[in-house]
C-alpha cells in the first residue's frame, strides 16, 4: 500500500514534470549564448573546440543579435573570424530566438560548399543545435543543401546571390550576406543584392540584415556602398599600455609618426608606435579587453554592442544601422611580424599590393593614376528633365565656391542610391563683402524649385567654401540661414580624410566650421562620373545626370568637372598621389564636392535615408485629397471624381 507521503511525492514529481514545458529560458545575449553553447568544428577551424569570444568580436556579435539594430555592416580583413562569428550568430538566432534565417553566398556553388563545410559540421558539434536536428546524417526533406528545417519549426536557407529567383518567396527574420563585395551589383537587372534580400525581412517583427565582406575596388565595392548608407562607422580603440591614450590601430607608412614600424630588412623587430606620445608597443603588451568601438562620424561609442553612449558619455538608444571596420592587426590568429612579411611580399607586385590592402588592411583598393577624364563622357549623360527637379529626387543640397569677384552655386538633387541630378547653376557677380551681393546669394539659397510631382522644393543643406575670402562673411550667413542649414567649409587635400567632418561644437564665431576631405570626395565622384550612362527612366545608384539646358550645363561646366586628374608627384622624398587641375578652371567640380559633402553630413549627423524619404514622399503624393475622399463617398468614377 502506497503511503500518503509517497503519494504526495509522486504528485509533486508529476506536477514538476508538467511545469517543465512552461519554463521560459533565461534570455541570453549573443556573446553569452556563444560562450556557453558554441563549438568550432575541426574541419574549418585552426583551434577547434569551445568558442571564446575575442574582445573586438564582443561588440560586433552583440550588435548582430541586438533586436533594436536592424542593419549591421562589417568591413573586414582576413583572419578576424568573421565566418565563425556569423555561424555563431546564426546558431543563436535558430536555437535561442527561434528566428528563420536566410544566408546568401555570392554563387550557388559557394552556398553549397558553405553548407557542407561550415553549417553541417557546426550543427554536428554544437549540442544545442544537434538536439534540434533529428534528421542529421541521413536523407530527409528537412536536410538539404539549401535548407535545414529544425524540429522547432525554424528554417535556415543558404542560397547563391547571383540568381534573382533566390531572392523571392522566402519570408525570414534574418538575412545575411557573406563576402558581399563578390556579389554582382545588379542581380539580373532587378536590383542590388541587399535591396532584393532585405525585402525578405520586411514582414518580420525583428528584422535583421547582416552584411560582411573583405572590400574590393573603391567606388564600386558592395560593402563600401552598404557602409556608406549607415550614419555610424565604428573603429576599435584600444588604450596604449604605456600612456593609456586610446587609438585605433593603423598600418601607417614611412611618413606617418604612428603605426607599425620595423628596422629595415628585419620584420621580426616590428612594434607599434603610439600616435599620441610615441610609445613603443609590442604585440604581447597590447591588452584589447578594455577596448571600445567609437564612431568616427558622431563620436557614439559602445564596449559591448548592448549599451551605447554619446561622445559626452550620455546613454543613448542603439542605432538603427551600424558599420564596423576591423583588420588583421587586432587578430590573435596571426602576428604583426607576418603582416610585415606580407607587406614586403606585396611590394614586389602591384596585384600583390592590391591583395594586401584588401585582405590584410581590410580597405578598398584605390585605382591609381589614370588618364584625364574626357568631358564628352559627361555630355553623354545629358538627359531631358520633365521638371526643374526630376521625379526621383527627394533631397536638394548646394555647394558654394567663393571667388574674389563672384560666388558660384550649383544645386544638386539626390535620389535613393545617391543617384545625382544637377538642378541649377547660379553665378552671383560682385564683391563678396558687399551686402547687395550677399543678398543675391541669400535669394539663391532660398530659391524654390518645382518638382515633377508639382510640389515645391527648397535646398535642405548648403556647404559654403570660406577659402579665398574673409571667413566671417560666410559665418554671418550661416547664422542668418541657420547654422545647421548653411555650413561653412574648408578643404583638406589629404588622402584618407572623411568626405566631411563636422565638429561637435561651434567655434568661437558661433558656427560649425566643417572640414571637407576633397581628395576622398573627388575619388568617389570621379569614379561615378566615369561610369557608363544609363537611361534616365532607369534608377541607377551613384549615377550622375545633367539637364538638357545649356543655361545650367554645357561643355564649359563639363570641362570644369573633369578639370583635375590624379598625378604622381614627389613630395619630401616620397611619391604622392595628388589631384591637379593643371591651372584649368574647376569651380563646377568644387561645388559638386561641397554639395556631396552636404549630402554626406546629412546622412552622418541627421541620419538622412534617401530610400525612406522617397517612400515617405511617395505615400504623401498618393494620399487622396479631401476633395477626392468626398467624391469617393459620393460614388465618383473609380472612387474619385474626374
Curated annotation (Swiss-Prot):
EC number: 3.1.21.4, 3.6.4.-
Sites annotated ATP-binding: 46
InterPro entries per the UniProt record, alphabetical: GpA_ATPase, GpA_endonuclease, Phage_lambda_GpA-like, TFA_Chaperone
Short motif Walker A motif, span: 76-83
Residue numbers binding ATP: 491-498
Binding annotation for Mg(2+): 401
Region listing for Leucine zipper, in residue ranges: 589-617
Keyword Magnesium: yes
Location of the region described as Interaction with the terminase small subunit in the Swiss-Prot/TrEMBL record: 1-48
Record-level GO BP terms: viral DNA genome packaging
Transmembrane segments: none
Name of the protein this chain belongs to: Terminase, large subunit
Species, as recorded: Enterobacteria phage P21 (Bacteriophage 21)
The organism's taxonomic lineage, starting at the top: Viruses, Duplodnaviria, Heunggongvirae, Uroviricota, Caudoviricetes
Amino acid at each position: 500500500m502506497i503511503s500518503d507521503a509517497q503519494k504526495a511525492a509522486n504528485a509533486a514529481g508529476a506536477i514538476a514534470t508538467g511545469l517543465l514545458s512552461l519554463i521560459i529560458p533565461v534570455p541570453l545575449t549573443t556573446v553569452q549564448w556563444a560562450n556557453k553553447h558554441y563549438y568550432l568544428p575541426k574541419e574549418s577551424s585552426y583551434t577547434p573546440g569551445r568558442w571564446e569570444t575575442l574582445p573586438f568580436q564582443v561588440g560586433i556579435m552583440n550588435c548582430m543579435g541586438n533586436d533594436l539594430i536592424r542593419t549591421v555592416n562589417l568591413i573586414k580583413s582576413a583572419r578576424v573570424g568573421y565566418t565563425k562569428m556569423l555561424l555563431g550568430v546564426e546558431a543563436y538566432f535558430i536555437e535561442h530566438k527561434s528566428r528563420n534565417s536566410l544566408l546568401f553566398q555570392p554563387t550557388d556553388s559557394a552556398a553549397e560548399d558553405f553548407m557542407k563545410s561550415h553549417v553541417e559540421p557546426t550543427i554536428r558539434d554544437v549540442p544545442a543545435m544537434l538536439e534540434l536536428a533529428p534528421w542529421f546524417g541521413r536523407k530527409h526533406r528537412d536536410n538539404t543543401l539549401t535548407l535545414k528545417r529544425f524540429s522547432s519549426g525554424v528554417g535556415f536557407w543558404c542560397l547563391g546571390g547571383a540568381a534573382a529567383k533566390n531572392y523571392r518567396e522566402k519570408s525570414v527574420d534574418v538575412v545575411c550576406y557573406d563576402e558581399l563585395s563578390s556579389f554582382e551589383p545588379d542581380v539580373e537587372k532587378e536590383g542590388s543584392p541587399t535591396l532584393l534580400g532585405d525585402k525578405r525581412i520586411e514582414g518580420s517583427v525583428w528584422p535583421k540584415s547582416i552584411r560582411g565582406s573583405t572590400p574590393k575596388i573603391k567606388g564600386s565595392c558592395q560593402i563600401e556602398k552598404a557602409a556608406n548608407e549607415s550614419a555610424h562607422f565604428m573603429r576599435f580603440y584600444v588604450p596604449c599600455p604605456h600612456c593609456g591614450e586610446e587609438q585605433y590601430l593603423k598600418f601607417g607608412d614611412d611618413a606617418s609618426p604612428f603605426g607599425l614600424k620595423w628596422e629595415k630588412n628585419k620584420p621580426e623587430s616590428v612594434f607599434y608606435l603610439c600616435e599620441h606620445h610615441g610609445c613603443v608597443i609590442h604585440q604581447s603588451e597590447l591588452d584589447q579587453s578594455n577596448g571600445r568601438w567609437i564612431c568616427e562620424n558622431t563620436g557614439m561609442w559602445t564596449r559591448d554592442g548592448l549599451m551605447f553612449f554619446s561622445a559626452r558619455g550620455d546613454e543613448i538608444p542603439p542605432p538603427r544601422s551600424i558599420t564596423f571596420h576591423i583588420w588583421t592587426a587586432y587578430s590573435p590568429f596571426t602576428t604583426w611580424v607576418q603582416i610585415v612579411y606580407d607587406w614586403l611580399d606585396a611590394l614586389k607586385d602591384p596585384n600583390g599590393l592590391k591583395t594586401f590592402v584588401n585582405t590584410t588592411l581590410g580597405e578598398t583598393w584605390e585605382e591609381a593614376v589614370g588618364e584625364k577624364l574626357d568631358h564628352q563622357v559627361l555630355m553623354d549623360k545629358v538627359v531631358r528633365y520633365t521638371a526643374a527637379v526630376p521625379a526621383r529626387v527627394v533631397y536638394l543640397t548646394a555647394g558654394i565656391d567663393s571667388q574674389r569677384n563672384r560666388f558660384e552655386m550649383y544645386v544638386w538633387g539626390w535620389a535613393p542610391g545617391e543617384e545625382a541630378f544637377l538642378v541649377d547653376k547660379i553665378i552671383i557677380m560682385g564683391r563678396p563683402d558687399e551686402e547687395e551681393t550677399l543678398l543675391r546669394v541669400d535669394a539663391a539659397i532660398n530659391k524654390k524649385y518645382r518638382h515633377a510631382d508639382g510640389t515645391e522644393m527648397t535646398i535642405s543643406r548648403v556647404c559654403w567654401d570660406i577659402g579665398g575670402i574673409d571667413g566671417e562673411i560666410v559665418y554671418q550667413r550661416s547664422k542668418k540661414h541657420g547654422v545647421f542649414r548653411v555650413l561653412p567649409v574648408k578643404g583638406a587635400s589629404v588622402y584618407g580624410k572623411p568626405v566631411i567632418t563636422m565638429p561637435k561644437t561651434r567655434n568661437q564665431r558661433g558656427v560649425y566650421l566643417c572640414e571637407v576631405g576633397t581628395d576622398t570626395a573627388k575619388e568617389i565622384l570621379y569614379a561615378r562620373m566615369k561610369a557608363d550612362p544609363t537611361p534616365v527612366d532607369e534608377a541607377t545608384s551613384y549615377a550622375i545626370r545633367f539637364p538638357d539646358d545649356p543655361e545650367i550645363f554645357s561643355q564649359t561646366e563639363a570641362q570644369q568637372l573633369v578639370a583635375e586628374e590624379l598625378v604622381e608627384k614627389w613630395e619630401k622624398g616620397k611619391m604622392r598621389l595628388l589631384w591637379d587641375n593643371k591651372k584649368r578652371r574647376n569651380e563646377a567640380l568644387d561645388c559638386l564636392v561641397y554639395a556631396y559633402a552636404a549630402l554626406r553630413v546629412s546622412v552622418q549627423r541627421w541620419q538622412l535615408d534617401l530610400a525612406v524619404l522617397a517612400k515617405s514622399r511617395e505615400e504623401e503624393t498618393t494620399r487622396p485629397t479631401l476633395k477626392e475622399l468626398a467624391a469617393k463617398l459620393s460614388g465618383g468614377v473609380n472612387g474619385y471624381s474626374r
